[in-house]
Every structure is written in C-alpha cells, then in structure tokens.
Amino acid sequence: MTVAVVRFGGSNCDRDAVRALAHLGVDAAVAWHDDGLPADTDGVVVPGGFSYGDYLRAGAMAAQSPVVAEVRALAADGVPVLGVCNGAQIGCEAGLAPGAFTTNASARFQCERVHLRVENATTPWTAAYSEGDVLEIPIAHGEGRFEIDDDAYADLVADDRVLFRYCNADGEVTEAANPNGSTGAVAGVTGDRDHVAVMMPHPERATLPALGATDGQGILGAFA
C-alpha cells in the first residue's frame, strides 16, 4: 500500500506520520497539497498541525483545498483515509465524518497522554484490539472538543460509529477523564463507511518504542 500524508501550510505532524508508518513497513510519503495526490495513492493520512494558522476555524480553510476533493473521491472509492488532530478537524469540515471539533472546555491547549477505550473493534482501525481495550495515546490540541447535536449523536451511537472514548486507566468513562469536554467523551469516529475515520489523539506518537508507547500501532496498522 502507498500512503499519501497530506501536508498543508502549517502542518507539523506529517513527518511523524511517515516515520511511524515506515516503522510498520508501510510505504508512505508526504504529499504537498498544491501538488495533489500521487497517482498510485491507495491510502491517505491527513495529519496534525495548524493548517493555515487555524484561521476562521481549525481545518476550515484546508477543507476547501482541491486536494481534499481528491481525498473525498478516493474515500468514495473505498480507499482508507485517516484524519488525525488537525486532520480530524479538516475531515469533519470536509464532510468526511460527522460533528465538529471546537475549543476545549478548558479554553487551554492541552498536551498530555490520555487513555482511550475501544468502542468498536470491527473496523480496520480497531481490528488489532478487542472491544473495551484501553489504549494510552497522546493528545496535543486547543480545539479538540467533539461536538454534535443530540439526534446526530444518537444515530452515531446506534450505527456503532464511535471508535474511541476518553476514559481513565481502568476503562471508565468519567468527566475527569474527558480532557476537552467532548460530547459523550468521543475521541474518534468513522465516516459513513468504516474505512474513513477521524480522531483527535495522535497514534503516530504512540507507535515507536523510543517514544515510550506503542498502543497506536494497531490503528496505523490498518494501512499495513
């Protein structure tokens, strides 16, 4: 599989993603947004950062880029697409996934390791885990609060499209374990089909043993 890691002006996690994927044996390379996606692309990561300085809303400007239209077209053809942090914001703004990511309830940038509970282990992104598994994955965001209206949230849950929820080390979903005030403590969801996903935590920062955590390997392993 050849994975394109899309870089916008302000992206800063693209090389991290490439290195993490390479560690898993995946052929990955950075694709500058103005150049479009390589013809042989059969996987896409939209990485973290601050595309276009987060002006208007985080991810709003990048979502209008022509390369995102290419990503949508590939997603429609069944190509796996993962948006991480700013990439998750872009994905929601572009309609690849439901909801939106807004300012943290704390109104602060938060950079820390958190725990995630696997809610659905039947997707490509979670097939390496079992339902209820607890992962330790870092976050680093100021606008990571997942928000969605009540009816859409009910549909999301009913359709089993929640991938991860923030939890404590024992797997309990509590207010204290929800770092940003996300609706339902949601940390990641799928699009209309489960080969498209967005998540706020950074699996690429929990893939290399040298980083002290490897729980993210199973997520990025969907591209392997």
From Swiss-Prot:
<comment type="pathway">
    <text>Purine metabolism; IMP biosynthesis via de novo pathway; 5-amino-1-(5-phospho-D-ribosyl)imidazole from N(2)-formyl-N(1)-(5-phospho-D-ribosyl)glycinamide: step 1/2.</text>
</comment>
<keyword id="KW-0315">Glutamine amidotransferase</keyword>
<feature type="active site">
    <location>
        <position position="204"/>
    </location>
</feature>
<keyword id="KW-0547">Nucleotide-binding</keyword>
<dbReference type="GO" id="GO:0005524">
    <property type="term" value="F:ATP binding"/>
</dbReference>
<dbReference type="GO" id="GO:0006189">
    <property type="term" value="P:'de novo' IMP biosynthetic process"/>
</dbReference>
<dbReference type="GO" id="GO:0004359">
    <property type="term" value="F:glutaminase activity"/>
</dbReference>
<comment type="function">
    <text>Part of the phosphoribosylformylglycinamidine synthase complex involved in the purines biosynthetic pathway. Catalyzes the ATP-dependent conversion of formylglycinamide ribonucleotide (FGAR) and glutamine to yield formylglycinamidine ribonucleotide (FGAM) and glutamate. The FGAM synthase complex is composed of three subunits. PurQ produces an ammonia molecule by converting glutamine to glutamate. PurL transfers the ammonia molecule to FGAR to form FGAM in an ATP-dependent manner.</text>
</comment>
<keyword id="KW-0963">Cytoplasm</keyword>
<comment type="subunit">
    <text>Part of the FGAM synthase complex composed of 1 PurL, 1 PurQ and 2 PurS subunits.</text>
</comment>
<keyword id="KW-0067">ATP-binding</keyword>
<keyword id="KW-0658">Purine biosynthesis</keyword>
<dbReference type="GO" id="GO:0004642">
    <property type="term" value="F:phosphoribosylformylglycinamidine synthase activity"/>
</dbReference>
<keyword id="KW-0378">Hydrolase</keyword>
<protein>
    <recommendedName>
        <fullName>Phosphoribosylformylglycinamidine synthase subunit PurQ</fullName>
        <ecNumber>6.3.5.3</ecNumber>
        <ecNumber>3.5.1.2</ecNumber>
    </recommendedName>
</protein>
<dbReference type="Pfam" id="PF13507">
    <property type="entry name" value="GATase_5"/>
</dbReference>
<dbReference type="GO" id="GO:0005737">
    <property type="term" value="C:cytoplasm"/>
</dbReference>
<feature type="active site" description="Nucleophile">
    <location>
        <position position="85"/>
    </location>
</feature>
<keyword id="KW-0436">Ligase</keyword>
<dbReference type="InterPro" id="IPR010075">
    <property type="entry name" value="PRibForGlyAmidine_synth_PurQ"/>
</dbReference>
<dbReference type="InterPro" id="IPR029062">
    <property type="entry name" value="Class_I_gatase-like"/>
</dbReference>
<feature type="domain" description="Glutamine amidotransferase type-1">
    <location>
        <begin position="2"/>
        <end position="224"/>
    </location>
</feature>
<feature type="active site">
    <location>
        <position position="202"/>
    </location>
</feature>
